[in-house]
Protein backbone atom coordinates (compact mmCIF):
# COMPACT_ATOMS: atom_id res chain seq x y z
CA UNK A 1 0.00 0.00 0.00
CA UNK A 2 2.75 2.43 1.01
CA UNK A 3 4.76 1.54 -2.08
CA UNK A 4 1.75 2.30 -4.31
CA UNK A 5 1.31 5.70 -2.65
CA UNK A 6 5.01 6.49 -3.04
CA UNK A 7 4.89 5.36 -6.67
CA UNK A 8 1.88 7.59 -7.35
CA UNK A 9 3.59 10.53 -5.65
CA UNK A 10 6.71 9.95 -7.74
CA UNK A 11 4.72 9.92 -10.97
CA UNK A 12 2.98 13.14 -9.89
CA UNK A 13 6.33 14.85 -9.32
CA UNK A 14 7.56 13.69 -12.73
CA UNK A 15 4.61 15.50 -14.31
CA UNK A 16 5.68 18.86 -12.80
CA UNK A 17 8.22 21.06 -14.53
CA UNK A 18 10.07 24.19 -13.47
CA UNK A 19 9.79 27.15 -15.86
CA UNK A 20 11.81 30.36 -15.77
CA UNK A 21 10.60 33.30 -17.84
CA UNK A 22 12.87 36.29 -18.39
CA UNK A 23 10.90 39.51 -18.19
CA UNK A 24 11.39 42.78 -20.02
CA UNK A 25 13.22 44.39 -17.09
CA UNK A 26 15.69 41.43 -17.05
CA UNK A 27 14.25 39.99 -13.85
CA UNK A 28 12.98 36.42 -13.85
CA UNK A 29 9.70 34.74 -12.97
CA UNK A 30 9.88 31.09 -11.93
CA UNK A 31 6.93 28.75 -11.57
CA UNK A 32 5.98 25.09 -11.74
CA UNK A 33 3.59 23.72 -14.35
CA UNK A 34 1.99 20.34 -14.94
CA UNK A 35 3.04 18.21 -17.88
CA UNK A 36 -0.21 18.87 -19.75
CA UNK A 37 -0.41 22.62 -18.96
CA UNK A 38 -1.28 24.72 -22.00
CA UNK A 39 0.58 27.85 -23.04
CA UNK A 40 -2.41 29.95 -22.00
CA UNK A 41 -2.03 28.80 -18.39
CA UNK A 42 1.61 29.92 -18.21
CA UNK A 43 0.83 33.21 -19.96
CA UNK A 44 -2.02 33.95 -17.55
CA UNK A 45 0.29 33.28 -14.59
CA UNK A 46 2.75 35.83 -15.98
CA UNK A 47 0.10 38.46 -16.65
CA UNK A 48 -1.30 38.02 -13.13
CA UNK A 49 2.22 38.44 -11.73
CA UNK A 50 2.68 41.64 -13.76
CA UNK A 51 -0.87 42.89 -12.98
CA UNK A 52 -1.37 43.20 -16.74
CA UNK A 53 -4.84 43.37 -18.34
CA UNK A 54 -3.96 44.59 -21.85
CA UNK A 55 -2.10 41.35 -22.45
CA UNK A 56 -2.94 40.58 -26.09
CA UNK A 57 0.08 42.53 -27.34
CA UNK A 58 2.50 40.21 -25.55
CA UNK A 59 3.74 36.66 -25.93
CA UNK A 60 6.32 34.14 -24.76
CA UNK A 61 9.34 33.25 -26.90
CA UNK A 62 11.52 30.16 -26.67
CA UNK A 63 14.25 28.35 -28.58
CA UNK A 64 13.85 24.67 -29.43
CA UNK A 65 16.69 22.08 -29.27
CA UNK A 66 17.49 22.82 -32.94
CA UNK A 67 18.07 26.49 -32.01
CA UNK A 68 14.98 27.68 -33.90
CA UNK A 69 12.99 30.42 -32.21
CA UNK A 70 9.23 30.21 -31.70
CA UNK A 71 6.31 31.98 -30.11
CA UNK A 72 4.60 29.76 -27.55
CA UNK A 73 1.18 28.65 -28.83
CA UNK A 74 -1.40 29.12 -26.10
CA UNK A 75 -3.68 26.27 -27.22
CA UNK A 76 -0.95 23.60 -27.04
CA UNK A 77 1.02 21.92 -24.26
CA UNK A 78 4.05 23.90 -23.09
CA UNK A 79 6.16 20.76 -22.57
CA UNK A 80 5.39 19.32 -26.01
CA UNK A 81 6.22 22.61 -27.73
CA UNK A 82 9.59 23.11 -26.04
CA UNK A 83 10.83 19.54 -26.70
CA UNK A 84 13.83 20.24 -24.44
CA UNK A 85 14.93 19.02 -21.04
CA UNK A 86 13.67 20.91 -17.97
CA UNK A 87 14.10 23.35 -16.37
CA UNK A 88 12.63 25.41 -19.20
CA UNK A 89 13.74 28.97 -20.00
CA UNK A 90 11.60 31.39 -22.01
CA UNK A 91 11.21 35.14 -22.56
CA UNK A 92 8.22 37.46 -22.11
CA UNK A 93 8.22 39.94 -25.01
CA UNK A 94 5.98 42.19 -27.09
CA UNK A 95 4.55 40.07 -29.91
CA UNK A 96 2.18 42.55 -31.59
CA UNK A 97 3.37 46.15 -31.39
CA UNK A 98 0.48 48.59 -30.83
CA UNK A 99 -0.12 50.76 -33.89
CA UNK A 100 -0.32 53.74 -31.51
CA UNK A 101 1.43 52.80 -28.24
CA UNK A 102 0.59 56.17 -26.69
CA UNK A 103 -3.10 55.24 -26.95
CA UNK A 104 -2.76 52.22 -24.66
CA UNK A 105 -5.22 52.48 -21.78
CA UNK A 106 -3.00 51.63 -18.80
CA UNK A 107 0.36 52.99 -17.74
CA UNK A 108 1.62 49.50 -16.85
CA UNK A 109 1.09 48.41 -20.47
CA UNK A 110 2.85 51.48 -21.82
CA UNK A 111 5.74 50.84 -19.45
CA UNK A 112 6.19 47.26 -20.68
CA UNK A 113 6.07 48.38 -24.33
CA UNK A 114 8.58 51.11 -23.43
CA UNK A 115 10.94 48.43 -22.06
CA UNK A 116 10.56 46.38 -25.25
CA UNK A 117 11.29 49.31 -27.56
CA UNK A 118 14.23 50.30 -25.39
CA UNK A 119 15.59 46.78 -25.99
CA UNK A 120 14.95 47.16 -29.72
CA UNK A 121 16.91 50.41 -29.73
CA UNK A 122 19.80 48.87 -27.84
CA UNK A 123 19.93 45.72 -29.98
CA UNK A 124 19.86 47.68 -33.23
CA UNK A 125 16.39 46.59 -34.34
CA UNK A 126 14.97 50.11 -34.08
CA UNK A 127 16.96 52.26 -36.50
CA UNK A 128 16.94 56.03 -36.57
CA UNK A 129 18.78 59.24 -37.39
CA UNK A 130 21.34 60.64 -34.96
CA UNK A 131 19.01 63.44 -33.86
CA UNK A 132 16.20 60.97 -33.15
CA UNK A 133 18.60 58.64 -31.33
CA UNK A 134 19.71 61.45 -29.02
CA UNK A 135 16.12 62.41 -28.20
CA UNK A 136 15.07 58.81 -27.50
CA UNK A 137 18.06 58.24 -25.24
CA UNK A 138 17.35 61.49 -23.38
CA UNK A 139 13.78 60.34 -22.75
CA UNK A 140 15.17 57.09 -21.32
CA UNK A 141 17.52 59.05 -19.03
CA UNK A 142 14.72 61.30 -17.80
CA UNK A 143 12.41 58.32 -17.19
CA UNK A 144 14.99 56.32 -15.27
CA UNK A 145 17.21 58.82 -13.40
CA UNK A 146 14.92 61.87 -13.25
CA UNK A 147 15.86 65.53 -13.63
CA UNK A 148 19.44 66.56 -14.24
CA UNK A 149 21.20 67.29 -10.94
CA UNK A 150 24.75 68.76 -11.08
CA UNK A 151 25.47 67.21 -7.70
CA UNK A 152 24.57 63.72 -8.87
CA UNK A 153 25.39 63.92 -12.56
CA UNK A 154 28.99 65.01 -13.26
CA UNK A 155 30.40 65.84 -16.69
CA UNK A 156 30.05 62.88 -19.03
CA UNK A 157 27.35 61.17 -16.95
CA UNK A 158 25.42 60.02 -20.02
CA UNK A 159 28.44 58.02 -21.21
CA UNK A 160 27.94 55.61 -18.31
CA UNK A 161 24.72 54.28 -19.84
CA UNK A 162 24.30 52.01 -22.83
CA UNK A 163 21.48 52.99 -25.19
CA UNK A 164 22.73 51.64 -28.52
CA UNK A 165 25.09 48.96 -29.85
CA UNK A 166 27.60 51.77 -30.52
CA UNK A 167 27.71 55.44 -29.67
CA UNK A 168 30.18 58.32 -29.87
CA UNK A 169 31.25 61.02 -27.44
CA UNK A 170 29.50 63.58 -29.63
CA UNK A 171 26.21 61.70 -29.33
CA UNK A 172 26.66 61.30 -25.57
CA UNK A 173 27.01 65.07 -25.23
CA UNK A 174 23.90 65.64 -27.33
CA UNK A 175 21.92 63.22 -25.14
CA UNK A 176 23.06 65.02 -21.98
CA UNK A 177 22.26 68.42 -23.49
CA UNK A 178 18.67 67.43 -24.28
CA UNK A 179 18.26 65.82 -20.87
CA UNK A 180 19.53 68.93 -19.08
CA UNK A 181 17.71 71.62 -21.04
CA UNK A 182 14.51 70.19 -22.51
CA UNK A 183 13.12 67.47 -20.25
CA UNK A 184 13.33 68.86 -16.75
CA UNK A 185 10.18 68.24 -14.74
CA UNK A 186 8.91 65.31 -16.79
CA UNK A 187 7.73 62.37 -14.70
CA UNK A 188 8.81 58.84 -15.67
CA UNK A 189 5.34 58.18 -17.12
CA UNK A 190 5.45 61.36 -19.23
CA UNK A 191 8.95 60.63 -20.53
CA UNK A 192 7.96 57.07 -21.41
CA UNK A 193 4.88 58.35 -23.22
CA UNK A 194 6.96 60.85 -25.22
CA UNK A 195 9.46 58.08 -26.00
CA UNK A 196 6.66 55.88 -27.36
CA UNK A 197 5.24 58.70 -29.47
CA UNK A 198 8.62 59.32 -31.07
CA UNK A 199 9.48 55.64 -31.57
CA UNK A 200 6.15 54.97 -33.28
CA UNK A 201 7.06 57.43 -36.06
CA UNK A 202 10.25 55.57 -37.00
CA UNK A 203 10.31 53.38 -40.08
CA UNK A 204 11.46 50.25 -38.25
CA UNK A 205 9.08 50.54 -35.30
CA UNK A 206 7.79 47.05 -34.55
CA UNK A 207 10.27 45.32 -36.86
CA UNK A 208 11.33 41.83 -35.78
CA UNK A 209 13.69 40.90 -38.66
CA UNK A 210 13.82 37.44 -40.22
CA UNK A 211 17.04 36.90 -42.25
CA UNK A 212 16.44 35.58 -45.78
CA UNK A 213 17.86 35.70 -49.30
CA UNK A 214 16.24 37.12 -52.40
CA UNK A 215 16.41 35.17 -55.67
CA UNK A 216 19.73 36.81 -56.54
CA UNK A 217 21.27 35.59 -53.29
CA UNK A 218 21.31 39.01 -51.67
CA UNK A 219 20.79 39.16 -47.91
CA UNK A 220 17.39 40.54 -46.93
CA UNK A 221 15.44 40.92 -43.72
CA UNK A 222 11.69 40.36 -43.78
CA UNK A 223 9.46 41.72 -41.04
CA UNK A 224 5.82 42.30 -40.13
CA UNK A 225 4.75 45.59 -38.54
CA UNK A 226 1.42 47.12 -37.47
CA UNK A 227 1.28 48.76 -40.89
CA UNK A 228 2.29 45.91 -43.18
CA UNK A 229 5.07 43.70 -44.55
CA UNK A 230 8.55 45.19 -45.00
CA UNK A 231 11.82 44.14 -46.64
CA UNK A 232 15.13 45.57 -45.45
CA UNK A 233 18.31 45.29 -47.51
CA UNK A 234 21.58 46.90 -46.57
CA UNK A 235 20.70 50.01 -44.64
CA UNK A 236 17.39 50.70 -46.39
CA UNK A 237 13.79 49.64 -46.30
CA UNK A 238 13.41 48.61 -49.94
CA UNK A 239 9.79 47.45 -49.92
CA UNK A 240 6.65 48.05 -47.92
CA UNK A 241 3.33 46.27 -48.54
CA UNK A 242 0.26 47.45 -46.66
CA UNK A 243 -1.81 44.75 -44.96
CA UNK A 244 -4.83 45.36 -47.18
CA UNK A 245 -2.64 44.57 -50.21
CA UNK A 246 -1.46 41.20 -48.83
CA UNK A 247 -3.81 38.49 -50.09
CA UNK A 248 -1.97 35.28 -49.17
CA UNK A 249 1.12 33.94 -47.39
CA UNK A 250 2.59 30.56 -48.30
CA UNK A 251 5.75 28.52 -47.81
CA UNK A 252 7.18 25.35 -49.32
CA UNK A 253 10.36 24.02 -47.75
CA UNK A 254 12.70 27.00 -47.43
CA UNK A 255 10.79 29.16 -49.93
CA UNK A 256 8.44 31.89 -48.70
CA UNK A 257 5.81 33.45 -50.97
CA UNK A 258 3.83 36.61 -50.35
CA UNK A 259 0.90 37.29 -52.69
CA UNK A 260 0.16 40.96 -53.33
CA UNK A 261 -2.81 42.60 -55.03
CA UNK A 262 -2.28 46.26 -55.85
CA UNK A 263 -3.98 48.87 -58.01
CA UNK A 264 -5.37 47.97 -61.44
CA UNK A 265 -5.94 44.39 -60.19
CA UNK A 266 -2.28 43.46 -60.68
CA UNK A 267 -1.37 40.31 -58.79
CA UNK A 268 2.22 39.81 -57.75
CA UNK A 269 4.07 37.07 -55.88
CA UNK A 270 7.19 37.99 -53.91
CA UNK A 271 9.67 35.15 -53.33
CA UNK A 272 12.35 34.82 -50.65
CA UNK A 273 14.42 31.95 -49.25
CA UNK A 274 14.80 31.28 -45.53
CA UNK A 275 17.89 29.57 -44.06
CA UNK A 276 15.99 26.40 -43.05
CA UNK A 277 12.51 24.91 -43.54
CA UNK A 278 11.90 25.45 -39.81
CA UNK A 279 12.84 29.14 -40.09
CA UNK A 280 10.57 29.48 -43.13
CA UNK A 281 7.65 27.94 -41.25
CA UNK A 282 8.27 30.29 -38.31
CA UNK A 283 8.30 33.24 -40.73
CA UNK A 284 5.03 32.06 -42.29
CA UNK A 285 3.31 31.60 -38.92
CA UNK A 286 4.44 35.06 -37.78
CA UNK A 287 3.01 36.51 -40.99
CA UNK A 288 -0.33 34.70 -40.56
CA UNK A 289 -0.68 35.92 -36.96
CA UNK A 290 0.30 39.51 -37.72
CA UNK A 291 -2.01 39.71 -40.71
CA UNK A 292 -4.93 38.39 -38.67
CA UNK A 293 -4.21 40.67 -35.71
CA UNK A 294 -3.84 43.92 -37.66
CA UNK A 295 -6.07 43.36 -40.70
CA UNK A 296 -9.24 41.64 -39.48
CA UNK A 297 -12.19 43.39 -37.87
CA UNK A 298 -13.08 40.55 -35.48
CA UNK A 299 -11.60 37.23 -34.39
CA UNK A 300 -14.62 35.33 -35.76
CA UNK A 301 -13.20 36.10 -39.23
CA UNK A 302 -10.04 34.08 -38.51
CA UNK A 303 -9.74 30.95 -40.66
CA UNK A 304 -7.40 27.97 -40.60
CA UNK A 305 -4.68 28.56 -43.19
CA UNK A 306 -2.76 25.97 -45.22
CA UNK A 307 0.90 26.55 -46.04
CA UNK A 308 0.70 24.97 -49.49
CA UNK A 309 -1.64 24.33 -52.41
CA UNK A 310 -4.89 22.42 -52.02
CA UNK A 311 -3.57 19.19 -53.58
CA UNK A 312 -0.27 19.08 -51.68
CA UNK A 313 0.32 18.16 -48.07
CA UNK A 314 1.37 21.16 -46.01
CA UNK A 315 1.19 22.76 -42.57
CA UNK A 316 -2.09 24.10 -41.25
CA UNK A 317 -2.26 26.92 -38.75
CA UNK A 318 -4.90 29.09 -37.12
CA UNK A 319 -4.38 32.28 -35.14
CA UNK A 320 -6.12 31.79 -31.79
CA UNK A 321 -6.17 35.26 -30.22
CA UNK A 322 -8.18 38.45 -30.47
CA UNK A 323 -7.55 41.04 -33.19
CA UNK A 324 -6.29 44.60 -32.65
CA UNK A 325 -9.70 46.25 -32.99
CA UNK A 326 -11.21 43.94 -30.36
CA UNK A 327 -8.26 44.53 -28.03
CA UNK A 328 -8.69 48.31 -28.25
CA UNK A 329 -12.43 48.03 -27.61
CA UNK A 330 -11.81 45.80 -24.60
CA UNK A 331 -9.14 48.16 -23.23
CA UNK A 332 -11.55 51.08 -23.35
CA UNK A 333 -13.77 49.23 -20.86
CA UNK A 334 -11.04 48.77 -18.23
CA UNK A 335 -12.04 50.49 -14.99
CA UNK A 336 -9.74 49.97 -12.03
CA UNK A 337 -7.28 51.86 -9.91
CA UNK A 338 -4.00 52.11 -11.85
CA UNK A 339 -1.68 49.35 -10.61
CA UNK A 340 1.58 50.29 -8.91
CA UNK A 341 4.56 50.17 -11.26
CA UNK A 342 7.92 49.04 -9.92
CA UNK A 343 10.27 50.63 -12.42
CA UNK A 344 13.74 49.20 -12.86
CA UNK A 345 16.38 51.94 -12.81
CA UNK A 346 19.31 51.99 -15.19
CA UNK A 347 22.62 50.49 -14.10
CA UNK A 348 25.62 52.49 -15.36
CA UNK A 349 27.74 50.19 -17.51
CA UNK A 350 30.44 50.59 -20.11
CA UNK A 351 30.03 47.08 -21.44
CA UNK A 352 27.29 45.67 -23.63
CA UNK A 353 24.61 43.69 -21.83
CA UNK A 354 24.31 40.08 -23.06
CA UNK A 355 21.66 37.48 -23.48
CA UNK A 356 23.17 34.05 -23.21
CA UNK A 357 22.06 30.44 -23.05
CA UNK A 358 23.88 29.79 -19.79
CA UNK A 359 22.14 29.10 -16.48
CA UNK A 360 20.98 32.10 -14.47
CA UNK A 361 20.50 32.55 -10.77
CA UNK A 362 16.88 32.93 -9.76
CA UNK A 363 15.78 36.40 -8.77
CA UNK A 364 12.79 38.14 -7.27
CA UNK A 365 10.56 39.29 -10.18
CA UNK A 366 10.71 42.97 -11.13
CA UNK A 367 13.91 43.60 -9.23
CA UNK A 368 16.79 45.80 -10.33
CA UNK A 369 18.24 45.35 -13.79
CA UNK A 370 20.91 42.73 -14.26
CA UNK A 371 24.11 43.33 -16.11
CA UNK A 372 24.29 40.80 -18.92
CA UNK A 373 26.74 40.24 -21.76
CA UNK A 374 25.89 40.32 -25.44
CA UNK A 375 27.95 40.16 -28.60
CA UNK A 376 26.71 42.83 -31.00
CA UNK A 377 28.22 44.03 -34.26
CA UNK A 378 28.91 47.70 -34.85
CA UNK A 379 26.87 50.76 -35.44
CA UNK A 380 23.39 52.06 -36.02
CA UNK A 381 21.90 53.07 -39.31
CA UNK A 382 19.52 55.61 -40.71
CA UNK A 383 16.48 54.66 -42.75
CA UNK A 384 14.73 57.12 -45.01
CA UNK A 385 11.70 58.80 -43.42
CA UNK A 386 8.41 57.31 -44.57
CA UNK A 387 4.68 57.70 -44.13
CA UNK A 388 4.19 53.93 -44.52
CA UNK A 389 2.73 54.27 -48.00
CA UNK A 390 4.21 52.63 -51.08
CA UNK A 391 7.04 50.13 -51.42
CA UNK A 392 10.19 51.97 -52.41
CA UNK A 393 13.85 51.56 -53.13
CA UNK A 394 15.84 54.54 -51.99
CA UNK A 395 19.31 55.82 -52.68
CA UNK A 396 19.24 58.40 -49.92
CA UNK A 397 22.13 58.32 -47.46
CA UNK A 398 21.29 61.28 -45.31
CA UNK A 399 21.89 61.61 -41.58
CA UNK A 400 23.34 58.18 -40.91
CA UNK A 401 25.48 56.49 -38.27
CA UNK A 402 29.17 55.60 -38.40
CA UNK A 403 30.52 52.49 -36.70
CA UNK A 404 33.51 53.61 -34.64
CA UNK A 405 35.98 51.07 -33.33
CA UNK A 406 36.94 52.48 -29.95
CA UNK A 407 36.61 55.65 -27.92
CA UNK A 408 39.72 57.42 -26.67
CA UNK A 409 38.29 57.07 -23.17
CA UNK A 410 38.20 53.28 -23.32
CA UNK A 411 40.34 51.10 -21.12
CA UNK A 412 42.59 48.64 -22.90
CA UNK A 413 40.39 45.66 -22.03
CA UNK A 414 37.07 47.42 -22.49
CA UNK A 415 35.01 47.59 -25.68
CA UNK A 416 33.09 50.83 -25.96
CA UNK A 417 30.10 51.23 -28.25
CA UNK A 418 30.24 54.26 -30.53
CA UNK A 419 27.92 55.83 -33.09
CA UNK A 420 28.68 58.63 -35.50
CA UNK A 421 27.68 59.28 -39.10
CA UNK A 422 27.71 56.25 -41.38
CA UNK A 423 25.50 53.25 -42.05
CA UNK A 424 25.02 49.79 -40.63
CA UNK A 425 23.01 46.71 -41.48
CA UNK A 426 20.20 45.11 -39.48
CA UNK A 427 22.48 42.06 -39.42
CA UNK A 428 24.46 43.90 -36.74
CA UNK A 429 21.62 43.44 -34.28
CA UNK A 430 20.62 40.45 -32.22
CA UNK A 431 18.36 38.71 -34.71
CA UNK A 432 15.27 36.74 -33.74
CA UNK A 433 16.05 33.79 -36.03
CA UNK A 434 19.09 31.56 -36.60
CA UNK A 435 22.05 33.12 -38.37
CA UNK A 436 25.41 31.49 -38.96
CA UNK A 437 28.46 33.14 -37.53
CA UNK A 438 29.88 33.35 -41.06
CA UNK A 439 26.65 34.63 -42.54
CA UNK A 440 26.92 37.82 -40.48
CA UNK A 441 30.20 38.54 -42.22
CA UNK A 442 28.48 38.06 -45.57
CA UNK A 443 25.62 40.36 -44.58
CA UNK A 444 27.98 43.11 -43.45
CA UNK A 445 29.57 43.49 -46.89
CA UNK A 446 29.09 47.02 -48.20
CA UNK A 447 26.05 47.64 -50.42
CA UNK A 448 26.08 49.67 -53.61
CA UNK A 449 22.73 51.37 -54.13
CA UNK A 450 21.60 51.97 -57.70
CA UNK A 451 18.29 52.82 -59.30
CA UNK A 452 15.71 55.42 -58.38
CA UNK A 453 12.68 55.04 -56.18
CA UNK A 454 10.27 52.55 -57.72
CA UNK A 455 7.08 50.67 -56.97
CA UNK A 456 6.56 46.93 -57.14
CA UNK A 457 5.00 47.26 -60.60
CA UNK A 458 8.21 48.89 -61.80
CA UNK A 459 10.17 45.99 -60.37
CA UNK A 460 8.45 43.75 -62.94
CA UNK A 461 10.10 45.68 -65.76
CA UNK A 462 13.56 45.06 -64.30
CA UNK A 463 13.02 41.32 -63.86
CA UNK A 464 14.88 40.56 -67.08
CA UNK A 465 18.19 41.75 -65.61
CA UNK A 466 19.42 38.40 -64.31
CA UNK A 467 22.74 37.80 -62.49
CA UNK A 468 25.85 37.23 -64.58
CA UNK A 469 27.39 33.78 -64.85
CA UNK A 470 30.12 34.77 -62.40
CA UNK A 471 27.58 36.02 -59.87
CA UNK A 472 25.48 32.89 -60.27
CA UNK A 473 28.52 30.72 -59.62
CA UNK A 474 29.28 32.71 -56.48
CA UNK A 475 25.82 32.10 -55.10
CA UNK A 476 26.39 28.33 -55.07
CA UNK A 477 24.56 25.28 -56.28
CA UNK A 478 21.79 25.31 -53.69
CA UNK A 479 20.65 28.83 -54.49
CA UNK A 480 20.90 28.22 -58.25
CA UNK A 481 18.56 25.27 -57.83
CA UNK A 482 16.11 27.38 -55.84
CA UNK A 483 16.21 30.24 -58.32
CA UNK A 484 15.30 28.30 -61.46
CA UNK A 485 12.81 30.25 -63.57
CA UNK A 486 9.15 30.41 -62.55
CA UNK A 487 6.25 30.77 -64.96
CA UNK A 488 2.96 32.56 -64.50
CA UNK A 489 -0.25 33.54 -66.20
CA UNK A 490 -0.98 36.99 -67.54
CA UNK A 491 -3.21 37.77 -64.58
CA UNK A 492 -0.93 36.39 -61.91
CA UNK A 493 2.78 36.90 -62.50
CA UNK A 494 5.47 35.84 -60.06
CA UNK A 495 7.89 38.69 -59.47
CA UNK A 496 11.33 38.17 -57.99
CA UNK A 497 12.21 41.35 -56.14
CA UNK A 498 15.76 42.47 -56.65
CA UNK A 499 16.55 45.20 -54.17
CA UNK A 500 19.73 47.26 -54.24
CA UNK A 501 22.44 45.39 -56.10
CA UNK A 502 25.12 44.10 -53.73
CA UNK A 503 28.78 43.58 -54.36
CA UNK A 504 29.61 40.05 -55.47
CA UNK A 505 29.25 37.72 -52.51
CA UNK A 506 29.99 34.04 -52.04
CA UNK A 507 27.33 31.72 -50.67
CA UNK A 508 28.45 30.65 -47.21
CA UNK A 509 25.36 28.84 -45.99
CA UNK A 510 23.29 29.42 -42.86
CA UNK A 511 23.85 28.17 -39.36
CA UNK A 512 21.74 27.78 -36.25
CA UNK A 513 23.44 29.97 -33.67
CA UNK A 514 20.88 32.14 -31.92
CA UNK A 515 20.69 33.94 -28.56
CA UNK A 516 17.59 33.73 -26.41
CA UNK A 517 16.15 37.22 -25.99
From Swiss-Prot:
Keyword presence, Phosphoprotein: yes
Q: Which residues form the FERM domain?
A: 17-298
Region ranges (Disordered) = 344-367, 385-408, 485-517
Endpoints of the signal sequence? none
**InterPro entries this protein is in?**
Band_41_domain, Ez/rad/moesin-like, FA, FERM/acyl-CoA-bd_prot_sf, FERM_2, FERM_central, FERM_CS, FERM_domain
In this chain, composition skew of type Low complexity spans: 498-517
Q: Which GO terms describe its molecular function?
A: cytoskeletal protein binding
Q: What does this protein do?
A: May be involved in regulation of cell migration. May regulate cell-matrix interactions via its interaction with ITGB5 and modifying ITGB5 cytoplasmic tail interactions such as with FERMT2 and TLN1. May regulate ROCK1 kinase activity possibly involved in regulation of actin stress fiber formation.
What protein am I looking at? FERM domain-containing protein 5
Q: Which organism is it from?
A: Mus musculus (Mouse)
Q: Which gene encodes it?
A: Frmd5
